[in-house]
Curated annotation (Swiss-Prot):
One family name in Pfam for this protein: Pkinase
Domain notes: The TXY motif contains the threonine and tyrosine residues whose phosphorylation activates the MAP kinases.
Protein kinase domain mapped to chain residues: 27-311
Record-listed Phosphotyrosine modification sites: 185
Catalysed reaction, written as an equation: L-seryl-[protein] + ATP = O-phospho-L-seryl-[protein] + ADP + H(+); L-threonyl-[protein] + ATP = O-phospho-L-threonyl-[protein] + ADP + H(+)
Localization terms from the record: Cytoplasm; Nucleus; Mitochondrion
Protein name: Mitogen-activated protein kinase 12
Length: 367
């Protein structure tokens, strides 16, 4: 059997958990960190700056048109994002020297250390930290929403946190209906807005605000707020707290099935949030009552939530970068596998790193 060709000049090869990695020589000390449905992540040290980075290798991104489309969208979304509370790209590279050879690419991002899910398992968070973490979630969401993107699947596991309690949102805009079919991974519904769970109607960016409310409540109480065993049970758990919606809301549902289901439910009164959220400050309770509203049209936006008195000590209007709308008209085009490869290769080669590569950037990098 012939041995594989030598590594590309300026690259080196290493086996990581039975997978061959070929990365740029500036990234040293590859250590496996974790793996998910679509790829594996290693930490590394950037030899130019000494900064720790996370490198993600997608599993066979061009195994099918569906996977190729997802890989292309992930790359374009990450390239678009330049905000301190949203994960962005420090670098992207391929060891493949031509389009014909192109099979893999690697995404380099800031290394964060942990995620909110792990953090909550290990310690009870105090009010100040909860306030700071929720503030950062909302700032990141305001930016993502201004770009015209809906996260759709915000949960503690995709909120990365470092040792300074700085937070970055991961995996935004990637949750599509096809995911479970592609990977067999079961999607957790506990943080999903009712209109997403039941496909009630065209949903808006406030689906993400519902998720923030669920996460904030969990940080306060140490327990998952709505822990349904399936989607109908999830809805029942939600309504035990929010109460059943008025008839006028039910009429607005686009699905007849959902309308009939809702009409058949016993009437439930809205609970007093303060009784569920023991130990929460009155301002925290008030903010949660504005986020966990069954009717999406009545839910606060990220910008409105940030202006809430709960964040008075943190609010800083100077801090907000402008964002261009993300053009997703390229993402849903039907292309052959070779066309997906070609457009992805072009995106990899056209990447320009943020100006302060790997350095700690206190203000957002302008687009």
């Amino acid at each position: 059997m012939s041995s594989p060709p030598p590594a590309r000049s300026g690259f080196y090869r290493q086996e990581v958990t039975k997978t061959a990695w070929e990365v740029r020589a500036v990234y040293r000390d590859l250590q496996p960190v974790g793996s998910g449905a679509y790829g594996a992540v290693c930490s590394a040290v950037d030899g130019r700056t000494g900064a720790k980075v996370a490198i993600k290798k997608l599993y066979r991104p061009f195994q099918s048109e569906l996977f190729a489309k997802r890989a292309y969208r992930e790359l374009r979304l990450l390239k678009h994002m330049r905000h301190e509370n949203v994960i962005g790209l420090l670098d992207v590279f391929t060891p493949d020297e031509t389009l014909d050879d192109f099979t893999d690419f690697y995404l380099v991002m800031p290394f964060m250390g942990t995620d909110l899910g792990k953090l909550m398992k290990h310690e009870k968070l105090g009010e100040d930290r909860i306030q700071f973490l929720v503030y950062q979630m909302l700032k990141g969401l305001r930016y993502i929403h201004a770009a015209g993107i809906i996260h759709r699947d915000l949960k503690p596991g995709n909120l990365a946190v470092n040792e300074d309690c700085e937070l970055k949102i991961l995996d935004f805009g990637l949750a599509r209906q096809a995911d479970s079919e592609m990977t067999g991974y079961v999607v957790t519904r506990w943080y999903r807005a009712p209109e997403v769970i039941l496909n009630w109607m065209r949903y808006t960016q406030t689906v993400d605000i519902w998720s923030v409310g669920c996460i904030m409540a969990e940080m306060i109480t140490g327990k998952t707020l709505f822990k349904g065993s399936d989607h109908l049970d999830q809805l029942k758990e939600i309504m035990k707290v929010t109460g059943t919606p008025p008839a006028e809301f039910v009429q607005r549902l686009q699905s007849d099935e959902a309308k009939n289901y809702m009409k058949g439910l016993p009437e439930l009164e809205k609970k007093d949030f303060a009784s569920i959220l023991t130990n929460a400050s009155p301002l925290a309770v008030n903010l949660l009552e504005k986020m966990l509203v069954l009717d999406a049209e009545q839910r606060v936006t990220a910008g409105e939530a940030l202006a809430h008195p709960y964040f008075e000590s943190l609010h800083d209007t100077e801090d907000e970068p402008q964002v261009q709308k993300y053009d997703d008209s390229f993402d849903d085009v039907d292309r052959t596998l070779d066309e997906w490869k070609r457009v992805t290769y072009k995106e990899v080669l056209s990447f320009k790193p943020p100006r302060q590569l790997g350095a700690r950037v206190s203000k957002e990098t302008p687009l």
